[in-house]
């Protein structure tokens, strides 16, 4: 189902949601951190979704073990490097990795700015080593409040040339986008792109707010857009992309089953929607699974899957020249 003549992208992929279980085990031993299990086989149920979680917040607790072992900046650098290695292994030509340095820093009180620098170093080294093209999206974790998000923003701004976009993720219901207007004003002033997690736990009004108040050019998940016909029309007309994450939305119980996922309807409506993983390490999936298993189960035709693959590059935070060069590079292989 993947068109090998086209670039394969993943533009909604959390770096801190893709920490290998083996790495969690090794870092736990290295830093003498107590883990819920001492072998890879027995650890996996604690760090990967085995059965669908009842809600988004329950799903997010599965992420915690990955960041609990980030006891040093070297550990942060390692998982960033491994994220690029994983992207290469799964055949990705281009990936946008998003991360929350405050979340990564929290368990061991690491310097937030230091985490940003370590992630940049690890990703750059990975790109040089494995030949994958990558850009970084800074996440503000809304769950920790406005002040913590301000600290994350300042850390990103210190490396503004290495950050491509700003995102807002976490507890969408408890911390609406209206709390973060000034943060996004500064991000736009820095020349960054804007993508926002919206319409995952909250309704279509959260998506409208992300677009109108925060300046979102893309929406993460956005499944609740299906409830508002005017919003669907607006997304299509303005070419505001939806970063769909099929398996993730089932595992968080955002959508009941793949057959009910709105991605097919987004594509039929002319909305620029793409296929992405979200937190592949926690989900136990990769981009190949999303294209070859999840997308057909969601009712997408072969042509719709191809269109979603095309959309992934069209939506990417790349210049027109960068997109052209990537197309030519893949076509020449």
From Swiss-Prot:
EC top class named in words: hydrolase
Q: Which domain of life is it from?
A: Bacteria
Entry's Gene Ontology cellular component terms? cytosol
Q: Which reactions fall under this protein's catalytic activity?
A: adenosine + H2O + H(+) = inosine + NH4(+); 2'-deoxyadenosine + H2O + H(+) = 2'-deoxyinosine + NH4(+)
Show the Pfam families listed in the entry.
Answer: A_deaminase (PF00962)
Residues the record marks as active site: 200 (proton donor)
Where is the site labelled Important for catalytic activity?
Answer: 221
* PANTHER family tied to this protein: ADENOSINE DEAMINASE (PTHR11409:SF43)
Q: What is this protein called?
A: Adenosine deaminase
Q: Which gene encodes it?
A: add
């Amino acid at each position: 189902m993947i068109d090998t003549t086209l670039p394969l992208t993943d533009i909604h992929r959390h770096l801190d949601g893709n920490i290998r279980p083996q790495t969690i085990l090794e870092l736990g031993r290295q830093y003498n951190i107590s883990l819920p299990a001492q072998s890879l086989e027995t650890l996996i149920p604690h760090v990967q979704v085995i059965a669908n979680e009842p809600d988004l917040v329950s799903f997010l607790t599965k992420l915690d073990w990955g960041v609990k072992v980030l006891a040093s900046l070297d550990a942060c650098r390692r998982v960033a490097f491994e994220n690029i290695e994983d992207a290469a292994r799964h055949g990705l030509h281009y990936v946008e990795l998003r991360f929350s340095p405050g979340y990564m820093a929290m368990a061991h009180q690491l310097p937030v700015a230091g985490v940003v620098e370590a992630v940049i170093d690890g990703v750059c080294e990975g790109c040089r080593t494995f030949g994958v093209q990558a850009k970084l999206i800074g996440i503000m974790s809304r769950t920790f409040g406005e002040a913590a998000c301000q600290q994350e923003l300042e850390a990103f701004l210190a490396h503004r040339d290495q950050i491509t976009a700003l995102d807002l993720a976490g507890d969408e219901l408890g911390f609406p986008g209206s709390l973060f207007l000034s943060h996004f004003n500064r991000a736009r002033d820095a020349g960054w792109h804007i993508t926002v997690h919206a319409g995952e736990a909250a309704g279509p009004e959260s998506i409208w707010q992300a677009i109108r108040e925060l300046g979102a050019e893309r929406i993460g998940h956005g499944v609740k857009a299906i409830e508002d016909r005017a919003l669907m029309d607006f997304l299509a007309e303005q070419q505001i992309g939806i970063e769909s994450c099929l398996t993730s939305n089932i595992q968080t119980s955002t959508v009941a089953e793949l057959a009910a996922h709105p991605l097919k309807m987004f594509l039929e409506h002319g909305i620029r929607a793409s296929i992405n993983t979200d937190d592949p390490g926690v989900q136990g999936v990769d981009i190949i699974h999303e294209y070859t298993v999840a997308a057909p189960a969601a009712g997408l035709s072969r042509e719709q899957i191809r269109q979603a693959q095309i959309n992934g590059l069209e939506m990417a935070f790349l210049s027109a020249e960068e997109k052209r060069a990537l197309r030519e590079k893949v076509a020449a292989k």
